């Protein structure tokens, strides 16, 4: 999929943009899987304001808000989208006649002489060139489609009363690839429910699920394209009996249809429970609690099968068979879950046109998962794509990897808004990836603004709605490194014979780095906002340095 950069890269590590969906941080894979019909709003944080999102916000933040219920009778909606995808440009490949003509020209340019008997075999003769006028293989057209179909369906309902509001949706996406064998299907389910318990307590329950399946041929797209453009249009694609013609190297169509498959199945289920509480007797003081639990699984299966290319004799019998590849099966399963807890205390006060607000947040994230995989080779037949059907026990392997991650953070923010604007925020984050003595980092940010349009000396400009200058400075932290580098890691190495028995060796993974800690990104931004004629024309200009 496409990658996103906000104001360029600002990290030595490949730290991605941070995605936040309904207040919960998610990875890019979860963001890509969102049904677009469920999205209410998307916004981008690109300056010091991203500091409040902490350790993964060094390259900016994309905020997503999903749709919620509205007062009124149930409103049903159904939408469907059908589309056709086509490449923006096809490579202009030579036909057989052009290829043969240019080939002969190239041989001449290299100093060979078609009239010299010792060089004649390097050239296409007149008979072959005339045959090339009518017989030409279109490798690209035979391997790739000119267009593919994609379709999307979505059904939703929303409604509610003063007490309970709901939004529910069900989506289905089906996308074909640009060559046979590629097929992607995805199902999305969402239910957002809001309940008003009393005048002080509101409860939110969000449930969502996603299941997807991607099937594709064993050959990679880039490799398949390379095989196609390297083929000569003078080479046959098929023999007269329909078998694959042996041109001496890998056959693009056979690679697509008969080299095996790769299948990836994913599912993610998320539950979020939120409480919004107005503190009695203290005007403007609110408490918010948000808890999220995600359960995900990923099952990948790769089955490699051999295919045969043939040369036929004049009588149509097989003169030579060439086999590419051998059978092998690899399966891997990942199961993981993560939990996020966010507790927020906010206070808002307005005094004589001046607004002040404060915020204090405690955030905790924990992720646990494990991967288990196995592979076997030399299957006696390809009709059963299961591990038990593999060949020799000596050519089988298995592996497993645990995964753990955790973060804690304390966030504070104070905001003053009026003619002059000021905001100070900080995060105090801890990451399990670092040594206990290097685990915590402090990341502050400050923003200042001045509404010039509120000043008396600007009142003479009656058509000026707003003129504001602003500046911000913030430090962001990044922990996008491998975990446990502050410990000495060991792995199994080669086996050696001791007392007539093989003994596995243990190999050190390197010198531990106890000094590894947060990578920091400093961001400075200066901007001007202006609008005139009741917002008819608005301008926003920014200069930033990272």
Where do the model's predicted regions map?
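Extracellular/periplasmic, surface-exposed regions of secreted and cell-surface proteins
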Residues: 16, 186, 192-201, 205-211, ...
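Flexible glycine-/small-residue-rich
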Residues: 6-10, 21, 46, 66-68, ...
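A generic structural signal for short coil/turn motifs at secondary-structure boundaries
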Residues: 28-29, 51-52, 176-180, 431-436, ...
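Short, glycine-/polar-rich solvent-exposed loops and beta-turns at beta-strand/coil boundaries
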Residues: 1, 32-37, 54-58, 182-185, ...
């Amino acid at each position: 999929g496409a990658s996103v950069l906000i104001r360029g890269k600002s990290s030595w590590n490949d730290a991605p943009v941070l995605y936040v969906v309904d207040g919960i941080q998610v990875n890019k894979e979860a963001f890509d899987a969102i049904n677009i019909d469920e999205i209410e709003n998307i916004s981008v944080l690109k300056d010091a304001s991203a500091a409040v999102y902490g350790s993964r916000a060094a390259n900016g933040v994309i905020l997503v808000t999903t749709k919620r219920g509205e007062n009124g009778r149930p409103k049903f909606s159904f939408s469907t989208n059908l589309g056709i995808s086509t490449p923006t440009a096809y490579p202009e490949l030579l036909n057989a006649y052009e290829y043969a003509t240019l080939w002969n020209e190239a041989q001449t340019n290299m100093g060979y002489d078609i009239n010299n008997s010792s060089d004649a075999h390097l050239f296409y003769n007149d008979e072959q060139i005339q045959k090339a006028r009518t017989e030409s293989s279109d490798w690209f057209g035979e391997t790739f489609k000119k267009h593919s179909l994609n379709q999307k369906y979505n059904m939703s309902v929303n409604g509610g009363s003063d007490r309970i509001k709901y939004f529910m949706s069900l989506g289905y996406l089906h996308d074909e690839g640009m060559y046979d064998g590629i097929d992607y299907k995805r199902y999305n389910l969402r239910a957002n429910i809001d309940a008003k318990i009393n005048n002080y307590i509101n409860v939110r329950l969000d449930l969502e699920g996603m299941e997807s399946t991607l099937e594709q041929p064993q050959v990679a797209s880039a490799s398949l394209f390379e095989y196609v453009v390297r083929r000569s249009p003078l080479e046959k694609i098929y023999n007269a009996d329909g078998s694959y013609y042996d041109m001496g190297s890998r056959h693009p169509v056979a690679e697509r249809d008969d080299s095996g498959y790769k299948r990836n199945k994913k599912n993610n289920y998320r539950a979020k429970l939120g409480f919004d509480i107005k503190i009695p007797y203290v005007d403007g003081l609110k408490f918010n609690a948000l808890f999220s639990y995600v359960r995900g699984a990923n099952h990948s299966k790769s089955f490699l099968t051999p295919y045969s290319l043939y040369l036929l004799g004049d009588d149509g019998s097989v003169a030579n068979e060439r086999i590419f590849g051998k059978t092998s099966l690899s399966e891997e399963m990942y199961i993981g879950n993560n939990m996020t807890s966010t507790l927020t205390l906010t206070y808002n006060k307005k005094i004589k046109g001046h607004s002040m607000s404060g915020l204090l947040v405690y955030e905790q994230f924990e992720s646990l998962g494990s991967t288990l995989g196995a592979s076997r080779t030399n299957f006696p037949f390809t009709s059963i794509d299961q591990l038990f059907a593999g060949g020799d026990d000596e050519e089988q392997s298995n592996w497993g990897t645990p995964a753990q991650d955790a973060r804690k953070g304390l966030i504070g923010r104070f905001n003053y808004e009026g003619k002059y604007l000021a905001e100070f925020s900080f995060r105090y984050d801890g990451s399990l990836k670092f040594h206990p003595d290097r685990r915590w980092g402090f990341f502050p940010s400050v923003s200042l603004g001045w509404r010039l349009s509120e000043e008396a000396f600007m009142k003479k400009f009656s058509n000026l709605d707003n003129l504001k200058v602003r500046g911000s400075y913030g430090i962001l932290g990044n922990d996008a490194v491998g975990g446990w580098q502050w410990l000495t890691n060991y792995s199994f190495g080669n086996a050696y014979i001791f007392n007539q028995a093989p003994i596995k060796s243990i190999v050190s993974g390197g010198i531990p780095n106890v000094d590894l800690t947060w990578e920091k990104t400093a961001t400075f931004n200066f901007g001007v906002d202006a609008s005139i004629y009741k917002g008819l024309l608005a301008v926003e200009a920014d200069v930033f340095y990272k």
